[in-house]
Amino acid sequence: MALSIAILDCDLLLHGRGHKTLDRFDIETVSDDFLLNTFGFPREFIYYLVELLKDSLLRRTQRSRAISPDVQILAALGFYTSGSFQSKMGDAIGISQASMSRCVSNVTKALIEKAPEFIGFTRDEATKQQFKDEFYRIAGIPNVTGVVDCAHIAIKAPNADDSSYVNKKGFHSINCQLVCDARGLLLSAETHWPGSLTDRAVFKQSNVAKLFEEQENDDEGWLLGDNRYPLKKWLMTPVQSPESPADYRYNLAHTTTHEIVDRTFRAIQTRFRCLDGAKGYLQYSPEKCSHIIQACCVLHNISLQSGLDAWTFERTEATDQSGEDIDPSDTDDPEALRVRQELIQNHFS
């Protein structure tokens, strides 16, 4: 499928003086390297996004001289992957900064509409077992269906004097909770929590906690969380004060397995540079920042399901936990302690 994208002089459109068609951008004339460097993805993936989102984008831009879905998607990808409206991508497709902003908004909304299709826990028993098998092969922990963690994405201070977004390191952020499988595919992405909330507080209020609390069958599987999370029958955390060799072996296996979600955060932030703070914080309201983060999560899953490597763009530094203290309360749930001890005895003794 060849895309010949007619580029419009959007500044003329903005001022109502008509429009003109500039030189066509023919995606077939550029290399995958050019597309990767400019828009972050190869041509076949861009073709797929156009087909996936074009109906939604056409609904949002029903003006006779609206920017085409093709250009909107390229503009949004350029922003997500560069973190700037002033990147070389602007020259590549010839639209103004104001038009880019509208394109990013339109594509972000279109991607969020698609979120239920690409992010979610499976109900298929065979797929659940596949998840468990893949996690088991990492370090020998059975029955794991997902790993959960939070990380902070920096945002500008809200217009209102709202301290709820100030985290323990003193900057404004959104605390994002992700759950992923062993491949880094997101099963849940809650990207709207104020930065002042601890990981434990986010988890307690999250849809994931409600989902697992309501499950009727204890054999559905476990999540793995670090010591910032509460120990539950369905949420296994490390032993905070290991005593036996089995405890140490379990903790090592837990750390190795749980690292998948941290790697996923790093890969997302590195592929989508608008989230990593290198070119400044996200300059939008908390709600719009949340939407942009969610859109990047959807793109992450779409790319993974399309065969792209989740770890291609992974950086090495740790994700930002914003100085949160480790939760010392291992004794909240005696039944959860029993379940974890049985796990350790049966598989790590």
Swiss-Prot record:
A Pfam short name: DDE_Tnp_4
Disulfide bonds: none
EC number assigned by the record: 3.1.-.-
Domain of life of the organism encoding this protein: Eukaryota
One Gene Ontology cellular component annotation held by this UniProt entry: cytoplasm
Domain DDE Tnp4: 148-301
Keyword line: Cytoplasm, Hydrolase, Metal-binding, Nuclease, Nucleus
PANTHER family membership: NUCLEASE HARBI1-RELATED, PTHR22930
UniProt name for this protein: Putative nuclease HARBI1
Record organism: Danio rerio (Zebrafish)
